[in-house]
């Protein structure tokens, strides 16, 4: 390629036009061989005088070892020189355009062509002519595109539009939302702020009038108003994204039951004995179908946990702090034994894992309150929380807001005393509270959920039959047995109402940091609040407790006025 080392540039003019042609280098045709191509023009174009020697641009890639060719260069439009517009005649416009001569081999020379006024459009992918693109042929260009390319462009446009439509803004500060956090769309800043607030100290004070504007630029100016707005827009501690809630809840339930099972290892060989007996029968029927009501009651009574002692003296006079500390300490101890008790109920371990944990989370305070009433049934005017801790109404009133709950507990205990509750009846009622606690929240969708729910209903029917059998052993007539069963079931509704009151009180004490909460008690409290919030948002028919509790209160009033005439 020594013949390419010297470049001679000269300008000449066409005889029949004003355009200029840039001649680059005169190259010996014998040195170029088959790579030099003579220029050709469209048949419809007038012939133009051309030099007898080929004029070409030497390829800079010859030294790379590939068989590249040179590119003939004739059109003045490629060099950025102005030409007269010939848009009126497409054939003339095409004839004056340059022709791209493709080499006989598969390699194509790479040459970047930059222009300011004109663009080049390849009409044919395999060796057609290059035509100048003017605004008049833009529509023709779009029509000439393959259908696949036009569909791809349309999809990209629709995707970008959908991206803008799916864009969410933070409900607190109106910044761009990074996701669905704590129940609302929020940005990373507000999500982190709310997380810090619910996990640590949140006693913020507004320096103004508690009406500060919270937006993207002023969200850090007032923490109190920012936290207030977080609650106003619906942020909550247990808020979950709708499409992720099922998966995350199942994972959380699995972790909780794993921890519960770890606590169960301390229950001794009795758990293993129960497990060996509780083998499922055909279909969804569990082992309780093979047990008679008497045997089932005996098994449930054997599962009763031992008595729990506080093991320390509470200083008198009682104060709100030491009373609440003692009660929460006892509750945490009882929760550990409650898990063991539930596992020992025949058929309980045969239902689904999710339902097992859900049942315990929904009913734990009701079970504790029923046990409290059973211990206090022979101590009028007092509540026996443990053998070494009992409180009268005056002693319990030292806790703010506890007097109403205390009175409701005493009233229910008095009603059990009037009914002369038997131990067998108490054991069945306690098991029924456990098995009936999440009926309004259960949403069976898959095959495993349906099978678990079927087993749960079968177990509940068996316990109900056992309660009917226990009532029949009292020697009452059929009418009296039916009335007694109705009164006992109405008391379960009253216990649930008292439990909801107690849960709200315990939660308020937690928020005020008035009492230390133990790990298991705190976990069960948070889980119950989460289920309660789901229940309150599920519709007006989800919570019939207030109406039922009013009926129970009227029953209590009637009983007290007529000297216990409702006793069967």
From Swiss-Prot:
Residues in the DNA-binding region annotation: 170-235
Domain NR LBD: residue ranges: 292-528
Zinc fingers, NR C4-type class: 170-190, 206-230
UniProtKB keywords: DNA-binding, Lipid-binding, Metal-binding, Nucleus, Receptor, Steroid-binding, Transcription, Transcription regulation, Zinc, Zinc-finger
InterPro entries linked to this entry: ER-beta-like_N, ER-beta/gamma, Est_rcpt/est-rel_rcp, NHR-like_dom_sf, Nucl_hrmn_rcpt_lig-bd, Nuclear_hormone_rcpt_NR3, Nuclear_hrmn_rcpt, Znf_hrmn_rcpt
GO annotation (BP), single: cellular response to estradiol stimulus
UniProt-annotated stretches for the region Modulating: 12-169
Family as reported in the entry's similarity comment: Belongs to the nuclear hormone receptor family. NR3 subfamily.
Primary role: Binds estrogens with an affinity similar to that of ER-alpha, and activates expression of reporter genes containing estrogen response elements (ERE) in an estrogen-dependent manner.
Subunit structure: Binds DNA as a homodimer. Can form a heterodimer with ER-alpha.
This protein's name: Estrogen receptor beta-1
């Amino acid at each position: 390629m020594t013949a390419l080392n010297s470049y001679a540039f000269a300008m000449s003019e066409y005889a029949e036009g004003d355009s200029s042609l840039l001649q680059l280098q005169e190259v010996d045709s014998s040195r170029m061989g088959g790579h030099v191509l003579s220029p050709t023009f469209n048949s419809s174009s007038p012939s133009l005088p051309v030099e007898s020697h080929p004029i070409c641009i030497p390829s800079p890639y010859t030294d790379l070892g590939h068989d590249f060719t040179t590119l003939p260069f004739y059109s003045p439009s490629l060099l950025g020189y102005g030409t007269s517009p010939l848009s009126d005649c497409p054939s003339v416009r095409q004839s004056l355009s340059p022709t791209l001569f493709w080499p006989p081999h598969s390699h194509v020379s790479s040459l970047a062509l930059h222009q300011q006024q004109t663009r080049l459009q390849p009409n044919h992918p395999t060796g057609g002519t290059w035509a100048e693109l003017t605004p008049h042929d833009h529509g023709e260009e779009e029509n000439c595109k393959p259908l696949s390319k036009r569909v791809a462009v349309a999809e990209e446009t629709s995707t970008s539009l959908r991206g803008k439509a799916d864009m969410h803004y933070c409900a607190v500060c109106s910044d761009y939302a990074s996701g669905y956090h704590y129940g609302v769309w929020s940005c990373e800043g507000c999500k982190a702020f709310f997380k810090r607030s619910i996990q640590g100290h949140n006693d913020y004070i507004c320096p103004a009038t508690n009406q500060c504007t919270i937006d993207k630029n002023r969200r850090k100016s007032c923490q109190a108003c920012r936290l207030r707005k977080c609650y106003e827009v619906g942020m909550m501690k247990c808020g979950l994204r709708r499409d992720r809630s099922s998966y995350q809840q199942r994972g959380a339930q699995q972790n909780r039951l794993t921890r519960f099972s770890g606590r169960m290892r301390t229950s001794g060989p009795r758990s293993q004995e129960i497990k060996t007996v509780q083998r499922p029968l055909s279909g969804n029927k569990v082992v309780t179908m093979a047990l008679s009501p008497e045997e089932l009651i005996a098994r449930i009574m054997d599962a009763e946990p031992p008595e729990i002692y506080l093991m320390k003296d509470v200083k008198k006079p009682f104060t709100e702090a030491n009373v609440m500390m003692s009660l929460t300490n006892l509750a945490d101890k009882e929760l550990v034994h409650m898990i063991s008790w539930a596992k020992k109920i025949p058929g309980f371990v045969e239902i689904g894992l999710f339902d097992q944990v859900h049942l315990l989370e929904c009913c734990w305070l009701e079970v504790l309150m029923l046990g409290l009433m059973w211990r206090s049934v022979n101590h009028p005017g007092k509540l026996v929380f443990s053998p070494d801790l009992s409180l009268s109404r005056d002693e319990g009133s030292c806790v703010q807001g506890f007097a109403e709950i205390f009175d409701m507990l005493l009233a229910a205990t008095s009603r059990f005393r009037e009914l002369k509750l038997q131990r067998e009846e108490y054991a069945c009622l306690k098991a029924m509270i456990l098995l009936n606690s999440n009926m309004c929240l259960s949403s069976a969708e898959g095959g495993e959920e349906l099978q678990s729910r079927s087993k749960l209903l079968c177990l509940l029917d068996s316990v109900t039959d056992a309660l009917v059998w226990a009532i029949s052993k009292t020697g009452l007539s059929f009418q009296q047995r039916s009335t007694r069963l109705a009164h006992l079931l109405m008391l379960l509704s009253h216990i649930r109402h008292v439990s909801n009151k107690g849960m709200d009180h315990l939660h308020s004490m937690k928020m005020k940091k008035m009492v230390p909460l133990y790990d298991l008690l705190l976990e069960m409290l948070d889980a119950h609040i989460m289920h309660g919030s789901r229940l309150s948002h599920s519709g007006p028919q989800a919570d019939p407790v207030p109406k039922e509790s009013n009926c129970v209160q009227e029953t209590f009033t009637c009983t007290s006025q007529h000297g216990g005439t409702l006793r069967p």
